[in-house]
Amino acid sequence: LGCYINPVHPDPVIRRAEINRFKEHLRYARQFGAPMVATETGALTTFQAQDPIHYEAIGWDTLRATVEELAEEAEKWGVFLGLEGVCTHTLSTPDKMRRILDEVPSSCIGVVLDPCNFIGTAAHLQDQIVDDSFRLFGDRIILAHLKDIYQDGEKAYHGKAGSGVFHTEAFLRKLQVYKPMIDVSLEDIKDLEVNETVALLKKLAPITQ
């Protein structure tokens, strides 16, 4: 299941409502046959207006407190709390993902790896970012998201997997090494593109068939 809340919302009342909504999803996840409930982690700049110097530290402490609470709830119900990093969010790099896993040492926390979210506009660094992800938390990945990066001049945007500048074949082969048979969800894809995209992905990485 996905319950994409803002775990670092600056308004504590709204943040509490978001946390409670996520906990409800954790309680009922097994009824839907879902082993996990996933979320992203809120904007890195959430507290910048409040404290231009220490805003990242404030956001981190807020995120850690939320993750601790949600991990405890996940443990009660035997499901995973899935954390997805994004280059503009509190978990903005593979190193930060590793840090939260170390600071909240719960076996019920897993990683939803969307490499394009970590890469953002830094396509030239994608191999390093992907390799860092597998090196730092490859054993904790519980789901992969797959899309592609397309460039229009200086702008980058996401679209269907396999036809952009993301090194899809290399990623799928690394994923097979670290997490064979893992589920992969296609994102940023239109209905009429599904069959064509799946066929292309099977051609790019036959090992995933």
State where each predicted segment sits.
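Histidine-acidic metal/acid-base catalytic patches
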Residues: 33-35, 68, 91-209
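Active-site acidic/histidine proton-transfer and metal-coordination neighborhood
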Residues: 7-111
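Conserved radical SAM core fold
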Residues: 6-7, 44-47, 118-119, 150-152
